[in-house]
């Protein structure tokens, strides 16, 4: 859970900016968007396969550039 302790002299805008960074870093919004609607098991499997393929291609591309 994202928590931000606001100091006495800290402005609301700065605290809000820090809170947004923490939320983004923890992936709360992306998780919320992913869980917004029911995802069928077949769709979940396809999404995971696409992500794995994307990671593999990225690793291959990185390896090719290094050579």
Swiss-Prot record:
Any one Gene Ontology cellular component term annotated for this protein: ribonucleoprotein complex
Gene from which this protein is expressed: rpsU
Lineage start: Bacteria, Pseudomonadati, Aquificota, Aquificia, Aquificales
Name of the protein: Small ribosomal subunit protein bS21
Keyword annotations from UniProtKB, A to Z: Ribonucleoprotein, Ribosomal protein
Organism: Hydrogenobaculum sp. (strain Y04AAS1)
Family per similarity comment: Belongs to the bacterial ribosomal protein bS21 family.
Domain of life from the UniProt record: Bacteria
GO BP: translation
PANTHER family attached to this UniProt entry: MITOCHONDRIAL 28S RIBOSOMAL PROTEIN S21 (PTHR21109), SMALL RIBOSOMAL SUBUNIT PROTEIN BS21 (PTHR21109:SF22)
UniProt GO molecular function: structural constituent of ribosome
Pfam families: Ribosomal_S21
HAMAP family xrefs: Ribosomal_bS21
